[in-house]
UniProtKB/Swiss-Prot annotation:
Keywords: Chaperone, Isomerase, Periplasm, Repeat, Rotamase, Signal. One of its GO terms (biological process) is protein stabilization. The lineage of its organism: Bacteria, Pseudomonadati, Pseudomonadota, Gammaproteobacteria, Enterobacterales. GO terms for molecular function: peptide binding; peptidyl-prolyl cis-trans isomerase activity; unfolded protein binding. Residues 1-21 form the signal peptide. It is found in: Periplasm. SUPFAM superfamilies: FKBP-like, Triger factor/SurA peptide-binding domain-like. It catalyses: [protein]-peptidylproline (omega=180) = [protein]-peptidylproline (omega=0). Its EC number is 5.2.1.8. GO terms for cellular component: outer membrane-bounded periplasmic space. The gene is surA. Chaperone involved in the correct folding and assembly of outer membrane proteins. Recognizes specific patterns of aromatic residues and the orientation of their side chains, which are found more frequently in integral outer membrane proteins. May act in both early periplasmic and late outer membrane-associated steps of protein maturation. This is Chaperone SurA. It comes from Buchnera aphidicola subsp. Schizaphis graminum (strain Sg). Residues 175-276, 286-386 form the PpiC domain. It comes from the Bacteria.
């Protein structure tokens, strides 16, 4: 729905703010893009709408700046529309009417009221509803070809997602507060390499004994009360990031009651016991589902009813054994990211789903293939692989990581694509 809203908004901004000129002027050519021209009126359609939105753009220097930006935008759109023509991208009148209907519904008005608003708000007598209609059609073409080209040029591997996810998890873990008890073997003031080596041997031997006998607590309390070459020490509510400054190697803290060491620190060797890790309690447990899916997503060329019919057609074919679930995922699913790995979405938290969708998943048996169900993303056929409980305080959604990396790459690739189009085109901008 947001896509439709912004398409409509763009067209309104493009056409409804053309100011009257008391004298009829010849429309000037501002730029030539291959065999297409951009007129002064095209620029003004956008510029004057911006002036109405923000009076500050009346400053001449800012107007010149905006005009240049608008010209560049129009050049880019012209190039993309040429690519759409090469790919034979066709947008039908029904598709445009579908966009208009959804926009009118959002505004709680009828299509006829929308048409009247278009003509009433337009100050350009040469502009008609058909012009507005065609502008939306072009905007849809731009979106379709841009989505097609960029999603074919961009690929996010499983390895990239995992590397970024691990980096986020490690960063998050380093900020957790940790309570530690230490058995500490300090260095003497005049230490040398031989002394450090012998101290390490002693610490290693003692650590093995503690781990074998599970006697850390006994010795910790003993050294706390009695003077010895070993000392007891406690560290409270410190982050892993802080602890790494004290201990001169990486700490691989995994769980409560874990025994680590001996670990070299600034002042000696430490044997550690993890007493508490922040947020490690049952209240933070959440259910996660490991699922595969086949997705049919509504779009500007496939409305919700058509998407529903498609997913039920696929479901019936799977049920009647015309083809397998894996075949449907690989050949028919609209989810490009998961289709190449059998539709595997990995582990997804119950918090991610609506109540109806959550209840739907809960009722499934392991390895059961579901009937079609609708979500905000489209229509799904689900296969439940497994269920588990995890600590949600430290959970990072893998799908969100993928979407973040995808958007980042698409933004970069769009810049490269537009640059290539400009490089291979004839573009002439005329100065005023």
């Amino acid at each position: 729905m947001k896509v439709y809203f912004f398409l409509i908004l763009y067209v309104f901004l493009s056409f409804f703010s053309i100011t009257y000129s008391k004298e009829l002027e010849i429309d000037k050519i501002i730029a030539i893009v291959n065999n297409q021209i951009i007129l002064n009126s095209d620029v003004n359609q956008v510029l004057f709408s911006l002036k109405e939105e923000d009076q500050r753009v009346k400053i001449p220097l800012k107007i010149n700046f905006l005009r240049n930006k608008i010209i560049k935008k129009l050049i880019t759109e012209t190039l993309i529309l040429e690519e759409a023509k090469k790919f034979n991208i066709v947008v039908t009148d029904d598709q445009v009417n579908n966009v208009l209907s959804k926009y009118a519904l959002k505004k709680n008005i009828t299509i006829e009221e929308l048409k009247r608003n278009i003509l009433m708000n337009n100050t350009n007598t040469s502009f008609s509803y058909n012009d507005y209609f065609n502008k939306i059609k072009n905007s849809l073409k731009v979106k379709i070809i841009q989505d097609y080209v960029l999603h074919n040029r961009v690929h996010i591997s499983e390895k990239e997602v995992d590397l970024f996810l691990n980096k986020l998890i490690n960063t998050q873990n380093e900020l957790k507060k940790i309570d530690i008890n230490c058995i500490f073997l300090p260095f003497i003031k005049e230490k040398n390499k031989i002394f450090i080596k012998n101290t390490k041997i002693l610490a290693d031997h003692f650590a093995k004994k503690i781990k074998k006998d599970a006697s850390f607590n006994y010795y910790y309390e003993y050294f706390k009360k009695n003077n010895n070459i070993f000392l007891s020490k406690e560290i409270r509510s410190k982050s892993l990031k802080y602890l790494k400054k004290i201990f001169l190697n990486k700490l691989k803290i995994i769980k409560k009651n874990q025994i680590l060491g001996p670990i070299l620190g600034l002042k000696g060797f430490y044997i550690l016991k993890i007493n508490k890790i922040e947020n490690e309690n049952k209240e933070n447990l959440t259910t996660e589902f490991h699922i595969q899916h086949c997705l049919i997503r509504p779009s500007v060329i496939l409305d919700d009813k058509q998407a529903k019919n498609s997913i039920y057609y696929i479901y019936n074919n799977i049920k009647n054994k015309k083809y397998s679930f894996d075949y449907a995922v690989q050949k028919l699913s609209h989810d490009v990211y998961s289709s190449h790995k059998k539709g595997d979405l990995g582990w997804i938290s119950t918090d991610f789903f609506s109540n109806d969708f959550r209840n739907f998943l809960t009722d499934l048996r392991k390895n059961e293939i579901s009937k079609p169900i609708k979500s905000n993303f489209g229509w799904h056929i689900i296969k439940l692989l497994d269920i588990r409980q995890v600590d949600k305080s430290n959970r990072i959604d893998k799908n969100l990581v993928y979407r973040f990396l995808l958007e980042k790459k698409i933004k970069k690739e769009r810049y490269n694509w537009i640059r290539q189009l400009k490089k291979s085109s004839y573009i002439k901008i005329f100065k005023n």
